[in-house]
């Protein structure tokens, strides 16, 4: 079990209090004692600090990757919506050009916009 404690005195106190109350197993107490010895040893403390820093960097990298993925998904969704709107505008223009009565394409366009609004409302 790999554990690292930023506040070894606090960790030791918590485990000791829990041990007095009988809530800590021997191996957990041994782990805390080992952590405390490592904390007292400058080389071990430096290794623990490096491991903690590497873990923080890894978490930052994972977070950035997740944010990048989320942004790409939003951009793709936006691009798809823009593409749909462009297709419908082009379709509407062709309908208006082909028909004498320009109300029907406008009504279809309004129906399509209402449908999209209802779909968005359903997912929010």
Swiss-Prot record:
What's the superkingdom here? Answer: Eukaryota
Subcellular location, in the record's words? Secreted
Repeat (RLWRNWE) positions are: 34-40, 61-67, 86-92, 107-113
Q: Does the keyword Mitochondrion apply?
A: no
Does the keyword Ribosomal protein feature in the UniProt annotation?
A: no
The entry's propeptide annotation covers: 23-94, 112-124
Enumerate the UniProt keywords alphabetically: Cleavage on pair of basic residues, Pyrrolidone carboxylic acid, Repeat, Secreted, Signal, Toxin
Annotated GO molecular function terms are:
toxin activity
Protein's name in the database = U-scoloptoxin-Er5d
């Amino acid at each position: 079990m790999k554990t690292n404690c930023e506040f070894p005195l606090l960790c030791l106190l918590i485990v000791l209090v829990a041990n007095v109350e009988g809530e800590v197993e021997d191996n957990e107490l041994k782990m805390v004692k080992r952590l405390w010895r490592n904390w007292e040893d400058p080389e071990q403390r430096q290794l623990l600090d490096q491991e903690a820093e590497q873990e923080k960097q890894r978490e930052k990298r994972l977070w950035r990757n997740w944010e990048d993925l989320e942004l790409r998904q939003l951009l793709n969704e936006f691009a798809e919506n823009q593409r749909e709107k462009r297709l419908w505008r082009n379709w509407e223009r062709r309908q208006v050009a082909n028909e004498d009565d320009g109300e029907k394409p406008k009504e279809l366009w309004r129906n399509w916009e209402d449908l999209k609004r209802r779909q968005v409302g359903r997912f929010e």
